[in-house]
Structure formats: structure tokens, C-alpha cells
A protein has these predicted regions:
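Conserved segment of winged-helix/HTH DNA-binding domains
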Residues: 22-45
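Short, charged beta-turn/beta-strand-edge "cap" motif at the junction between a beta-strand
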Residues: 91, 173-176
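Basic, amphipathic "hinge/linker" alpha-helix immediately C-terminal to the N-terminal HTH DNA-binding motif
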Residues: 11-26
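Short alpha-helix capping/helix-loop boundary micro-motifs
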Residues: 152-158
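Short Lys/Arg-enriched alpha/beta "domain-start" segment
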Residues: 43-70, 76-77, 92
Length: 176
């Protein structure tokens, strides 16, 4: 009914498999239970590879409807662009699902009269244990679930020796 499991009948044998939708629900429930049981700060560590984006981050990050909110809610106007990281392991992609249930710092959706721009959730993070940044979760994105986006005060690529193919570690602290 909810498509959380699939039943496979083969002769007299019946197998039950958890679907991707079911797995996502389990991850969400696990996150909710963990939050209710543990009031301390937890840390999510992710690893991936720096990849080029489509250049759209610069456009969206420069929109006044976003920049005003970023300034008031995270304390700065981010560099106009995002740093795209492809998560190399499935376990890191699965770890990202818990952010769907977490509040983060919410940047509200807005309209400019012609179109509506989706909400953004920000989570404080550290790139390679040294560079302060924000992991952003977007209401709308062209990326698949293996690619995450980071924002910062400055152009991370320019201020570091990072380039496409560089290995990246991201540490996100979550207040429960």
C-alpha cells in the first residue's frame, strides 16, 4: 500500500524486500528516534570528490531574496556560487537523508513576480577540518542524491588548492 516493501513470489517461496522509499522512511524514523533519545550534539562525517557544477549556483546565490536572508540568518552573504561534492560512498549518500527531517537554518522560498524560488536549509560544516562553510539542502535541485552543495563567505576553490577530483571531507555538527 505505501510501497515501503515489495513482495516477490517465486513458486512456493515468498521474499520481502525493503524498497528505496521504505529505506528512506527507516532512515528518517531512525533520525527522529535518535534526536529524541540523545540531546547532545552529533556529528556527520562525509567524504567525496570535488566536481564542477552547471554554473547555476552563482545565479541563485546572488538573488536578493536569498542574500538578504543569508545575511540575517547565517551572518554573511555567501560567495556567489556553490562548491559541488560528489559523495563517493552509498553510506554517505544515505547519511544525507537524515537532513530531510532536521530543521537547520531555513531560508524561505520567495517570488519575484515571475517565478518562485525554493527554500534552502543550511547546516554549519567544516571542509577538510579547517574551512567554515554551510551544507545547503535545496527544495529544488538538478543534482542527483550523490551530489551535495556547500557555500562559504569566500570562493573556496580560489582560496585553496582544491580542484576537480580533489578528495574532500565534510564534518557537520547537528544539535539535537
Amino acid at each position: 500500500q505505501n510501497k515501503f516493501i515489495s513482495r516477490i513470489i517465486s513458486g512456493r517461496n515468498l521474499s520481502v524486500k525493503i524498497t528505496n522509499k521504505g529505506y528512506s522512511e527507516i532512515v528518517k524514523l531512525s533520525s527522529i528516534l535518535q534526536k529524541s533519545l540523545d540531546s547532545s550534539t552529533s556529528v556527520v562525517n562525509l567524504q567525496g570528490t570535488l566536481v564542477s557544477g552547471m554554473g547555476e549556483g552563482a545565479y541563485y546565490m546572488g538573488l536578493k531574496g536569498y542574500t538578504k536572508q543569508f545575511k540575517s540568518k547565517i551572518g554573511y552573504v555567501p560567495f556567489p556560487g556553490t562548491l559541488n561534492v560528489r559523495l563517493d560512498k552509498k553510506i554517505h549518500q544515505e547519511a544525507m537523508k537524515q537532513f530531510e527531517t532536521l530543521d537547520g537554518v531555513k531560508i524561505k522560498s520567495f517570488s519575484d513576480g515571475k517565478r518562485t524560488y525554493g527554500w534552502v536549509k543550511c547546516f554549519s560544516a567544516k571542509l577538510n577540518n579547517s574551512i567554515k562553510c554551510q551544507l545547503i539542502i535545496l527544495e529544488r535541485t538538478h543534482h542527483d542524491e550523490s551530489v551535495i552543495e556547500l557555500i562559504s563567505k569566500t570562493c573556496i576553490r580560489k582560496n585553496t588548492k582544491l580542484k576537480d577530483g580533489s578528495k574532500i571531507s565534510i564534518k557537520i555538527e547537528i544539535d539535537n
